[in-house]
């Protein structure tokens, strides 16, 4: 059996975590046992949960895509709320942890995990009532990858679907920091690896170009801003949090 909106067998997706030794992120921090355990113990985003509750009341159905779901920090609570959740990630250990949590909470009929990159989502057009990009788009290594990820999110979102964004702000870095050559918002100064740090204007423009309009129901927030006169926050990123909506 397959879902008409998602051409994969859900049980196979869940069980794949336990039988596959393939891990695209093997050896990276994202698949390290300590990192996975830390993510598995992290509390869900309270603002996201409140937004998801309202979206569940508004939507005629209840399908949510959690991009970069990790160990299920938000995906498991979303399933508990009543959403049918598809969580994607590129770390097998993270997906295994999310699947294990779903089984422990008897939510394996509501949470399905898939090994997939954010710019190639294995779902049909207009499949989801809510899309979550929580700490994932900032990991894009180029503007091209970032824009493809936004385009994919727009493709699989139903018209009017909500989008919850949690991503790095340009204010994380000193004003004099220079982006990677040829890139408008990709920097290496934070971690040594290319990552996306957009200004608010850039983020809004990119989402508008992809077909997402701001949702006034969730205030655009910026967390961890440095105090006046401080140029850098050190190892703590400044974070944007906002909601948007897929335009018809």
Walk through the language-model features, giving the residues of each.
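A short SAM/SAH-binding and catalytic strip from SAM-dependent methyltransferases
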Residues: 130-144
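A short acidic, Gly/Pro-enriched loop at the edge of an enzyme's catalytic core
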Residues: 119-131
């Amino acid at each position: 059996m397959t879902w008409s909106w998602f051409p994969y067998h859900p049980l196979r997706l869940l069980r794949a975590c336990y039988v596959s030794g393939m891990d695209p992120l093997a050896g990276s921090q994202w698949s390290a046992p300590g990192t996975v355990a830390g993510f598995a113990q992290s509390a869900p985003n309270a603002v996201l949960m409140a937004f998801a509750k309202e979206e569940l009341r508004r939507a005629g159905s209840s399908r949510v895509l959690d991009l970069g779901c990790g160990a299920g920090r938000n995906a498991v609570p979303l399933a508990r709320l009543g959403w049918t959740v598809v969580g994607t990630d590129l770390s097998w250990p993270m997906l295994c942890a999310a699947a294990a949590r779903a089984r422990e909470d008897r939510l394996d009929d509501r949470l399905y995990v898939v090994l997939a990159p954010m710019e190639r989502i294995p779902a049909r057009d207009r499949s989801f009532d809510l899309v979550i990009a929580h700490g994932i788009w900032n990991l894009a290594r180029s503007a091209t990858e970032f824009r493809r990820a936004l385009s994919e999110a727009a493709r699989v979102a139903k018209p009017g679907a909500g989008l919850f964004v949690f991503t790095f702000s340009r204010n994380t870095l000193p004003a004099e920091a220079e982006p990677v050559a040829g890139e408008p918002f990709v920097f290496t100064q934070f971690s040594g690896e290319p990552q996306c740090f957009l200004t608010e204007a850039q983020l809004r423009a990119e989402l508008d170009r992809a077909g997402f309009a701001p949702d006034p129901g969730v205030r655009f927030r910026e967390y961890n801003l440095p105090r006046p006169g401080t140029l850098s926050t050190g190892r703590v990123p400044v974070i944007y949090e906002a909601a948007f909506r897929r335009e018809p």
